[in-house]
Curated annotation (Swiss-Prot):
Family in the record: Belongs to the UPF0320 family.
Xref: Pfam families: DUF468 (PF04318)
Record protein name field: Putative UPF0320 protein YDR543C
Note in the entry: Contained within a telomeric X element core sequence.
Region (Disordered): 80-99
Lineage: Eukaryota, Fungi, Dikarya, Ascomycota, Saccharomycotina
The organism of origin for this protein: Saccharomyces cerevisiae (strain ATCC 204508 / S288c)
Domain of life: Eukaryota
Amino acid sequence: MAHLSLNQYKCTHIIIHGTCLSGLYPVPFTHNAHDYPHFNIYISFGGPKYCKTALNTYVIPLLHRILTTQFIYTYANITEKSPPKSPKHKNILSFNNNT
């Protein structure tokens, strides 16, 4: 597997969507890199309250080992008041390579 530098390819983005329990989420995560140019990686999970703990314990450390130059930019915990099929209905973990 070749190493991909997001610093060289500004438009490169990785999208992961799912739940902490079952893996893939049935509704596609539709945000694109050009919608939010300062975001490079979107990780969207829905599920129980311990989902954030699972992300902090397993997913984030793994990504830090893979993407050693990437830094967590923001974490938005969206409430259930959002429309069910809206991308904002999920917990969004965003990485930024401009730090």
